[in-house]
Regions:
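Conserved functional hotspots at enzyme active or ligand-binding sites that engage polyanionic ligands
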Residues: 1-138
Length: 138
């Protein structure tokens, strides 16, 4: 209750927290420029680096994703399930664990992907597959 003659201080405007990619998120990122047979244009990208790193450095470390069917036989591609909507509806998405990359996500205009957060089991499998190649820790 407010006493007579007193007014409530206006509440501070809510600050909108800027979006920053986080570990285990799928984002859209522009892979251009590219060289040779590298993936080009805008593609989904699985984020491996933690939010605090991404925010402070403007870099994001992760793995590109594709719906190219020939990856079904690729031992370093992990199936991430089927696309629920959009022009790729019903197509299987693959995380390409043999192609780790880093990008400046701010400069490249990264955006959240409709997939959102990759399921824990799929994320763990992608990390394990990558570690078979780079053999971190141990």
């Amino acid at each position: 209750m407010v006493a007579a003659g007193k007014t409530l201080a206006p509440s501070a405007p809510r600050r909108r927290v800027p979006w920053v990619p986080d570990r285990q998120s799928v984002i859209w990122i522009d892979c251009n420029p590219q060289v040779g047979r590298e993936m080009k244009d805008v593609h989904p990208f699985l984020v491996l680096s933690p939010r605090v790193f991404n925010e402070r450095t403007s870099l994001v470390i992760g793995l590109p994703m594709t719906t190219a069917h020939y990856n079904a036989d690729n031992p370093f591609a992990v199936s991430a399930g089927t696309s629920p909507s959009g022009r790729k509806t019903g197509k299987t998405s693959y995380v390409l664990c043999h192609q780790p990359k880093s990008f400046d996500w701010r400069i490249r205009g990264a955006k959240a992907h409709p997939i959102g957060i990759l399921p824990e089991a799929v994320f763990a499998q992608a990390c394990e597959r990558l570690n078979q190649i780079i053999q971190l820790g141990g």
